[in-house]
Amino acid sequence: MFNFKLDSFQEKAIDAISKDENVLVTAKTGSGKTLVGEYQIHHSLQKGKRVFYTTPIKSLSNQKFHDLKKIYGDRVGIMTGDIKFSPHADIVIMTTEILRNLLYKQGTPIGITPELSLQNLDAVVFDEVHYINDPSRGSVWEECLVLLPPEINLVLLSATLDTPEPFVHWLTDLKGKMCHLISTEYRVVPLIHMTENGEVIMDAKDTFHFEKYKAWIRKYYSQQDELRKHKERVKAREEGQVIEKEVRVGSFLDRMNKLILKMDKPALFFVFSRKMCEEYASKVSTDLLTSSETADVRHIVKYHLHKYPELQTMEGYHKLTGLLEKGVAFHHSGMLPILKEIVEILFDKGFIKILFATETFAVGINMPTKTVVFTSYRKYDDAAENLRVLRTSEYIQMAGRAGRRGKDDKGIVIYLPIHEPETPDVVKEMMTGKRATVESQMKFDYSYVLASLGSGKTIENDTYWMRQNNQEVEQYKDELATIKRELDTFTMKEKEHMYEFTQRAQLQEQIRYGTAESKKVVQQKISKWDNSHVGPYWDSMKKKHERHEQLVARSHKIETTLDSLKLFLKDIELRKLFLEKQGYIENNGLTQKGILASEVHEAHPILLTEVYTKKLLQTNESNEIVKVLSCFLEHDETDTKSPIAQLGKQMQECEILKTDWIVTDYWYDVVGDWLEGNNYVCEQYGIEHGNFVRAMLKLANIVREWVNIATLQQDTEMIEKMNGIEQKLVRGFVIPNSLYLRI
């Protein structure tokens, strides 16, 4: 099958797959682990069977569909939520959520019949399986692994992980057959990490050069100091005349353009800001393409995008195409998906010499480059609501884009800081620190309870969460027993004498809050206590008292933790009680109302079902219904006190659910204007086109689920009312299709 020599880890993985055994391959970006998944596809087809290939994001699914279609033609299908093409094909590419929803539906007659089937399925390839660690989505991967029948073979492809053995042991026990852990740190194309002036920070053997980095920092600050003095002299001479930022000698833009001229290309600049991606791209001062290449770019852009005349009215389109003709581009999640794809297509063909991108470009998309440039080692963390240093796994994944197998003898990773550079200790820890461990992110939420009761698949006892939870409980119990044994060694006399130290601490506390007169009295008591507790014996008692306090504090902390672990499991029972009270379940099975809720994946299942079954929108026109449904779309500035009257009462009645949902009125007026035919809502409301497209496609899915509920209820009035509404949502530049499906 392969006309080149395989690496050792690839040979081991292929051997396991040939024996129909499961494999987890952990390797760095660019190491060739994708080949393992491709062999599983070949092996399954040779047996006359089918294979699923799952990815964490739609864009990666689209690209994988394109890659495999070039090899297997019409035997490849795709299911992503927005795109459905040939779901019964021999090879089906899908997002992991699609597989999870199918697995709960499989074998149960309730609800809408799924479009996918496990019939004749031999294997599932999970690409980027380290997403199991993602706090918001990791549960999906874990549910899939538990729900898949043991006879279906698994190929798990992951970035490097720290101590993945416990996870592999769980998977082996779960499936009742061997799961091979195949890990490699080897890269065919080694990486050299350096500063903007070529000083090596970390070499190809992953040795961090601490002193060299320190020396570079000193030189950097010296140059910045000279730049500051120069600017002050110029300012005095010019008497306040404004100097254009982009031409200032020594400024970031000046350093960036000098680096672009001398560096090996193509190059990928990671910029952790959508706005600045576009800003820096527009400041590249050099045309990097020949006139012939520019003509080719124009032809490719016209060929792929001529079907979308609405793009011509968008400022961002003209901004991007102007840069593309110079060999420069930007790529971030705020862009229209098809514009991101045209950038990827041109990058893959070698027409993009300099690309400014956010972190999303590092996820899965197979776009290697010669050089990677970091403009910062910090990114915004939504959870922390602040900037933080990149985790080692994040840095490795992004840096791993450098070095093209078969083209480059090494990959170059450069640090070109916009602001002050990070300290040597911070950079060393980031580059050489531990990889991520596999930590269960399992969520036993309302969607899980509904899905498990509807399918009859109660899986909590089989989850990796339960394995980790049980191990954690046992470890804490063992530690508690050890603490108890040590506490039992203290004699009654020692405890009495140790208590005297507690009394002294109480006196010390009185000094903090007493009056001047009372403090004087207390200080005299403390002095008297100190004078009567001297000598080796009391020194020994003091140490024993400190140790006793440590043990008691640790014991209380462990007991609190154990209580919280037990309460977590009780959450499922509390949710079941609530669902029973609200009429969703009966006798540990779903009622008709529960079946309706189990059809909802894109919005909160309980709240949406309550709105429907209480007929709160029955008399509304279709546009108004969709505007209300838009409240289920997430937005950064979410507000659970939505003013939408139709939802307010239901939210109050379901107060117990409050922590489970996010509703916002952010999209309410936007959607109303869009449905009325306003094509300029993004400009009017200041919304990035990519964000708007994602929101409208998700809203279209919510509308489909609303119609599914109406179908199950045989509500012909609602079905007819909603007829044609999807065409009003998905129109113009809201394009569900992918360029990858047509090339």
Give the positions of each predicted feature:
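Non-catalytic terminal extensions of ATP-dependent helicases
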Residues: 329, 334, 348-352, 442-743
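Conserved pre-motif I regulatory segment
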Residues: 1-26
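Conserved interdomain linker/interface between the two RecA-like ATPase lobes of SF2 helicase motors
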Residues: 146, 153-155, 160-172, 176-283, ...
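Conserved segment of the helicase C-terminal RecA-like domain
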Residues: 367, 371-429
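Conserved C-terminal RecA-like helicase domain
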Residues: 50-54, 62, 69-78, 253-254, ...
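Walker A/P-loop NTP-binding motif
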Residues: 15-22, 32-49, 142-148
